[in-house]
């Protein structure tokens, strides 16, 4: 398995798809990288030469923020929003949607699961 940016990319998939296993690289970025390195996107990872893998590694490491660095940057951006107390930061803190979606109903993904509904028990009548 080729290891790029600390991620083992799948050997049996096309290079274009395999690169998307790296956090921060999607299909568009993947095709862009392959165009810059002059690698055919339809080639399987197992068929890449060592030189091609090295070229991929160099371009990704030099020009793209991926994996841990990108995750850290996103977390710091969210933390900054929460620290300055802006609307988006408050919504992050409360665990609610940020972009104006309704919350009276829906928003389940952001708000989390509700507990199981427990029906009221009937009290035994005295005879």
Curated annotation (Swiss-Prot):
Entry-linked Gene3D superfamilies: 1.10.8.50, 30s ribosomal protein s13, domain 2 (4.10.910.10)
A GO cellular-component term linked to this record: cytosol
GO MF assignments: rRNA binding; structural constituent of ribosome; tRNA binding
Keywords: Ribonucleoprotein, Ribosomal protein, RNA-binding, rRNA-binding, tRNA-binding
Pfam families recorded: Ribosomal_S13
Superkingdom of origin: Bacteria
Residue ranges of the region described as Disordered: 95-127
Database matches in PROSITE patterns: RIBOSOMAL_S13_1 (PS00646), RIBOSOMAL_S13_2 (PS50159)
Disulfide cysteine pairs (residue numbers): none
GO BP field: translation
Assembly mode: Part of the 30S ribosomal subunit. Forms a loose heterodimer with protein S19. Forms two bridges to the 50S subunit in the 70S ribosome.
Similarity comment: family membership: Belongs to the universal ribosomal protein uS13 family.
Function recorded in the entry: Located at the top of the head of the 30S subunit, it contacts several helices of the 16S rRNA. In the 70S ribosome it contacts the 23S rRNA (bridge B1a) and protein L5 of the 50S subunit (bridge B1b), connecting the 2 subunits; these bridges are implicated in subunit movement. Contacts the tRNAs in the A and P-sites.
HAMAP family per the UniProt record, alphabetical: Ribosomal_uS13
Protein name: Small ribosomal subunit protein uS13
Organism lineage string: Bacteria, Bacillati, Chloroflexota, Chloroflexia, Herpetosiphonales
Gene encoding the protein: rpsM
């Amino acid at each position: 398995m080729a290891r790029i940016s600390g991620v083992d990319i799948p050997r049996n998939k096309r290079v274009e798809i395999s690169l998307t296993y790296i956090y921060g690289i999607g299909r568009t970025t993947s095709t862009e990288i392959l165009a810059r390195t002059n690698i055919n996107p339809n080639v399987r990872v197992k068929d890449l030469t060592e030189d091609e893998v090295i070229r991929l590694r160099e371009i990704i490491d030099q020009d793209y923020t991926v994996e841990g660095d990108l995750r850290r940057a996103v977390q710091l951006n969210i933390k900054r929003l929460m620290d300055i107390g802006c609307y988006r930061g408050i919504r992050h803190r409360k665990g609610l949607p940020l972009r104006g979606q309704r919350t009276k109903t829906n928003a389940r993904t952001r708000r989390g699961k509700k507990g199981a509904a427990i029906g009221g028990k009937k009290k035994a009548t005295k005879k």
